[in-house]
Amino acid sequence: MSNKKLIINADDFGYTPAVTQGIIEAHKRGVVTSTTALPTSPYFLEAMESARISAPTLAIGVHLTLTLNQAKPILPREMVPSLVDEAGYFWHQSIFEEKVNLEEVYNEWDAQIISFMKSGRRPDHIDSHHNVHGKNKKLLGVALALARKYQLPLRNASRSIETKDYLELYQDVRTPDEMLYQFYDKAISTETILQLLDMVVCSEGEVFEINCHPAFIDTILQNQSGYCMPRIREVEILTSQEVKEAIEERGILLANYESLAM
């Protein structure tokens, strides 16, 4: 019997109404245990209400963003001028790093967390859109500061930061032992999920996370994201009986960030 715990987190909750419904479906009928919501989305409050009514057991964290397409910050433009283009929208992910001021990033991300809590719910954890805190050590520092301020777990940033001592940066911040990002785009398949489950069983550590992007498709998503059709396939796989049985056969316990020890 395995003692492994697995968080399966769906990113982008509240991105569009169809994304929200796809994530709820993957939770209610499938293996998704957790999600992270976008307070900068115009559909955020609608998504939180949908979760309250239709998926009360779904853990929800904050998906901090600096790069959400066609979205604007929570704070007024004059307070975060380095984060936005001339029209007041977030920079594209390909160029934002050279533009942003870290103090403004801290203030905006802090405002996003506060906006989430104004929905009447405390976040389960925090992570970031496009995993920006896992690609830039300075942005990781901002995310860690906010995790400490609010005493929230933070997604493991080990994938992209090329340093052996990155975990030392976390110190008293709770994080899964390992983050598994491989279930994405062309690698979306039942075989990929089964391989990741085997990695969980064979790896050191107790708590693991697989991130995913299940969704239904609407015209809003098609107009805003280049990653659309694979999301439907994710819903199909994450609600499949084969995946449910594979998790049970390996003795893996589905969990959320509350499973991380204080």
Swiss-Prot record:
GO terms for molecular function: deacetylase activity; hydrolase activity, acting on carbon-nitrogen (but not peptide) bonds, in linear amides; metal ion binding. Disulfide bonds: none annotated. It is an enzyme of class 3 (hydrolase). This is Carbohydrate deacetylase. Belongs to the YdjC deacetylase family. Signal peptide: none annotated. Mg(2+) binds at residue 129. Pfam families: YdjC. GO terms for biological process: polysaccharide catabolic process. Its cofactor is Mg(2+). Homodimer. Its EC number is 3.5.1.-. InterPro entries: COD_ChbG_bac (IPR022948), Glyco_hydro/deAcase_b/a-brl (IPR011330), YdjC-like (IPR006879).
